[in-house]
Every structure is written in C-alpha cells, then in structure tokens.
Amino acid sequence: TILISVTCILLNMPYPFIPFQMTLLDNFVEGFPSFMILFEKNISKQKESIGRYTMRYSFPNAIAIVLCVIALKLLAPTLSLSLNQAFTILYYTTAILSIHMIYRIYSPINLYRTVVLIVDIVAFVLVSYITYDLLQLAPVTSLLLQYLIMTLLFGLIVSTCLSKIVVHYLDTHPQD
C-alpha cells in the first residue's frame, strides 16, 4: 500500500483503490486466510524471522503490483483506457496476485488449505459480484478482459521471477 501510494504521487495519479475495494481486498487476502490458518494444527517452531518471511512472500508480490500500476499508467492513453477501466484492471489484478501469494504461503497444500483457498476465491468473486456497484468498477468488456489477462500475466511473471531471486538470495545468505 505504501509503495502504491508513493508510486501514485510520483506518477501524479489518483490512488487506484477506493476504501471499499481495499476493505474487500484486505478481508480476502489478509483476514480470512490468516484467520483460517490459525485452526490448523501446527506445533513446529517458526524457521525464519518475520523480515525474511516478508521478503520471501510479500516483497515479490508488492513489486509486481507496483509495476502493474506503473505499466497501466504509462499504457492507458495508448490503449484508450479510462481511469476507471485502468483501476478496474488493477483491482482484479491485485486480488488475483494476492491470492496467488496466499497460495505460495500455504504451500505445501493439503486438503484443509485447499478448501480455505477455494472458499476464499469463491467468496471474493461472489462478494465482488454482489457489491459490483459499490466497488465502482467499469464494466468488464471482452477488450478490458484481454487487458486484464495481459496485466495479470505480466504481474505473475514479475512476481514469480522476483520470488525465485529472493528465495535464492535468502537460501544462500542464511540467518545470523
């Protein structure tokens, strides 16, 4: 969120999410999966510090989302995207990239974690559909869907590549 805010200031653009969108993203990315993992029996001790854990999982995703914001800001005029259309793409891209991060955190996947992920995804889609007007999103046309898929693929590639680099670095530079 801080990186997106700084990016928006530097690019002289409005923040791409309204409070209600942030509430939904927070509930389905941070809230529900974190709450549900508490019910899983886990007696093993944390293997790495919170800083290293954050670098391993959150950092690649955060950079990927910021790069998607920058890419859409730069390409929106060329693609004839309105601000609302660009923000709609960013809303869905952020949600999917964040759920992908939850998948990585939950790995290795077991039945319980699979069910939690499926419930999280279905609930996010249903709530987004039910509250579509409140989310102030642009209608998803076939062209907008194509741009969304391209942005999402870009974000997934960036996130995956950065994740591999960060994991390699953390694995070759053990904790002190």
Where are these regions (language model features)?
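Membrane-embedded transport module
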Residues: 1-112, 121-132
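Conserved N-terminal alpha-helical segment that immediately precedes and caps sugar-phosphate-binding
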Residues: 11-14, 156, 160
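Short, Lys/Arg-enriched, Gly/Pro-containing loop segments at transmembrane-helix junctions
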Residues: 46-50, 114, 168-176
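Small-residue-rich transmembrane alpha-helices that serve as helix-helix interface/gating elements
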Residues: 90-94, 142-159
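Membrane-interface capping segments at transmembrane-helix boundaries
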Residues: 106-107, 160-176
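Interfacial helix-loop-helix linkers and transmembrane-helix boundary segments
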Residues: 110-114, 137-138
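Transmembrane alpha-helices
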Residues: 118-127, 148-156
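Membrane-helix boundary connector in multi-pass membrane proteins
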Residues: 133-145
